[in-house]
Amino acid sequence: MSVTKQDVEYIATLARLSFSEDEKEKMTKELNTILHYVEKLNELDTEEVEALNNMNERHNVLRPDEIVASIENSKAIKNAPDSVERFFKVPKVIG
C-alpha cells in the first residue's frame, strides 16, 4: 500500500488543512515512509510474545497539570467552516 498526492489532498480536505505543492510532496513521502515501517513490523513473528495490557508496569501515571499558552480564538475561528462572532457554528444534532 502506498499514499499518493491525491490521498494527501483528500485527507487535507477532510481535516480542513491546506498545503503548498512542496508540502504535499513532503507529506506524501513521509506517510509512505511510515507505511513502509509498519509493513516491516507486520513481518515480525509475534507468535511466542505474550500480549500486554500496558507497555510497562506502572499504572495511572499522570502528568502534573500545567497552564500553557493555547491558540488564539481569532486564529481558531479562521479554521472553522462557519462561525458566529467569536464562536464556532455547528449543525444542530439534537432534534
Curated annotation (Swiss-Prot):
Its function, per the record, reads: Allows the formation of correctly charged Asn-tRNA(Asn) or Gln-tRNA(Gln) through the transamidation of misacylated Asp-tRNA(Asn) or Glu-tRNA(Gln) in organisms which lack either or both of asparaginyl-tRNA or glutaminyl-tRNA synthetases. The reaction takes place in the presence of glutamine and ATP through an activated phospho-Asp-tRNA(Asn) or phospho-Glu-tRNA(Gln).
Substrates-to-products reaction catalysed: L-glutamyl-tRNA(Gln) + L-glutamine + ATP + H2O = L-glutaminyl-tRNA(Gln) + L-glutamate + ADP + phosphate + H(+); L-aspartyl-tRNA(Asn) + L-glutamine + ATP + H2O = L-asparaginyl-tRNA(Asn) + L-glutamate + ADP + phosphate + 2 H(+)
- The name of this protein is Aspartyl/glutamyl-tRNA(Asn/Gln) amidotransferase subunit C
The UniProt family comment states: Belongs to the GatC family.
Which organism is the protein's source? Chloroherpeton thalassium (strain ATCC 35110 / GB-78)
Under the subunit heading, UniProt states: Heterotrimer of A, B and C subunits.
GO BP term, pick one? glutaminyl-tRNAGln biosynthesis via transamidation
Gene behind the chain = gatC
Ligase: is it a keyword of this entry?
A: yes
Which Gene3D superfamilies does this UniProt record tie to the protein? Answer: Glu-tRNAGln amidotransferase C subunit, N-terminal domain (1.10.20.60)
What PANTHER family does UniProt report for this protein, alphabetically? GLUTAMYL-TRNA(GLN) AMIDOTRANSFERASE SUBUNIT C, MITOCHONDRIAL (PTHR15004:SF0)
Enzyme superclass (EC): ligase
